From Swiss-Prot:
InterPro entries: Dup_hybrid_motif, Phage_lysozyme2. Its main location: virion. GO terms for cellular component: virion component. Its cofactor is Zn(2+). In the N-terminal section; belongs to the glycosyl hydrolase 24 family. In the C-terminal section; belongs to the peptidase M23B family. Keywords: Antimicrobial, Bacteriolytic enzyme, Cell wall biogenesis/degradation, Glycosidase, Hydrolase, Late protein, Metal-binding, Metalloprotease, Multifunctional enzyme, Protease, Virion, Zinc. Residues 1-159 are annotated as: Lysozyme-like glycosidase. Residues 160-165 are annotated as: Linker. Substrate binds at E137, R138, P139, A140. Binds 1 zinc ion per subunit. The active site is at E45. This is Morphogenesis protein 1. Zn(2+) binds at H188, D195, H280.
Length: 365
């Protein structure tokens, strides 16, 4: 639930929207500090309201619109229309902000911090509010310390439980040594499959996340798995994933078996059509196993994903990564990023609201 209308929101309504934004961005790798720094700015810009027009002048596209008051409004509106998104929907505007992070849009590095670095920062919410003000909003009057005060308020007030249960998808081996890459001429033509060898034959690999076995193919020596929940992928995307591990000569599990992240999943091998001991991996988006297709070589049916975009390589030794963009991640499984001290929350809440009113934070722009 969130509020979206061409009107100034009340503190109660802003709190609902602020919590929604926190819950949306935490699982996508943002720190609570960064989110609250941005919220401190959104409060002044829009009363944290995706449906508001600057000065309530609805339809005046030369002015600002939305959470961060994109100006002119067409900067956001045209993008939303091109992507088939509802203009005044909270998710649409948060997707736009995530797109700006990924595409280096809107942000000008005026405080020695990129937009991507901002999203991961553990500096204080107050300081991050000032960085967001300078590098993203860039108003005519840069002297607005109340935005930092507002950021501190949100940091103390919001519960920060948005990422509970989200796990990082971890590469299943402790070594990367590729023998055949994507579109490999031997047996990977047209696919994103990759073959890996371990430090010795029958090398163990482990569950990259909590998952369930959804298919067993004895003739081809493979098991198919789906993540039990959406996972944080190496590229920063939260999604369900389905994958196959092929060539284990002694398949350990049957359909329906559940594994916890880090539990033994299998071993490299020569089962099926293999000329040497290795692990064959292929990953698709979603939580539905759909069988195989020819591309012209065999791959999972569905939207294939680059393995290096899915599995983080934290602690993994890379012997031969074929130059692919393997990534580490600072995501902590189940972390709610709630580093604030809630002991004094109740007695501070009234004082913070009064401070916000005194500094004119609810007047907008």
């Amino acid at each position: 639930m969130f509020y979206s209308k061409n009107a100034y929101l009340s503190m109660k309504e802003m709190t609902v929207n602020a919590q929604y934004i926190l819950n949306y961005l935490l699982p996508r790798g943002w720190t609570k500090n960064a989110i609250c720094g941005m919220l401190g700015n959104m409060q002044t810009e829009s009363t944290i309201n995706p449906g508001i027009w600057q000065n309530l002048d609805e339809g005046n596209t030369s002015l600002g619109f939305g959470l961060v008051q994109w100006t002119p409004a067409t900067k956001y509106l045209n993008w939303a229309d091109r992507n088939g998104l509802k203009r005044d929907h909270m998710d649409s505007q948060l997707k736009r902000i995530l797109w700006e992070v990924d595409n280096n849009e809107q942000w000008i590095n005026l405080r020695n911090m990129t937009f991507k670095e901002f999203t991961k920062s553990t500096k204080s919410a107050n300081e991050l509010a000032m960085i967001f003000l300078a590098s993203y909003e860039r108003p005519a009057n840069p002297n607005q310390p109340e935005r930092g005060t507002q950021a501190e308020y949100w940091f103390k007030t919001l519960t920060g439980k948005g990422s509970t249960g989200i796990q990082l998808a971890q590469f299943p081996m402790d070594i990367i040594n590729i023998t055949q890459g994507e579109n490999g001429s031997f047996s990977h033509k047209g696919t994103l499959c990759i073959d890996f060898v371990g430090k010795h034959e029958k090398y163990p690999y482990y569950a990259p996340c909590d998952c369930t076995c959804v298919w067993r193919g004895d003739e081809s020596a493979y098991l198919a798995w789906t993540s039990d929940k959406e996972v944080m992928c190496a590229d920063g995307t939260v999604r369900y994933i389905t994958w196959v591990c092929v060539h284990d000569e002694n398949l350990l599990y049957n359909v329906g078996k559940k594994l916890k992240k880090g539990e033994l999943m299998g071993h490299s091998g020569k089962g099926g059509r293999a000329t040497g001991d290795h692990l064959h991996l292929n990953v698709i988006e979603g939580n539905k196993y759909q069988g195989w297709v020819k591309k012209p070589d065999s791959a999972l049916a569905g939207t294939e994903l680059h393995i290096y975009d899915v599995f983080a390589v934290n602690g993994v030794e890379i012997v031969n990564g074929l130059g692919y963009d393997w990534k580490t991640s600072d995501w902590v499984d189940g972390s709610d990023e709630n580093n604030g001290d809630d002991k004094d929350k109740d007695k501070d809440e009234t004082k913070n609201i009064v401070n916000l009113l005194l500094c004119g934070a609810l007047n907008g722009w």
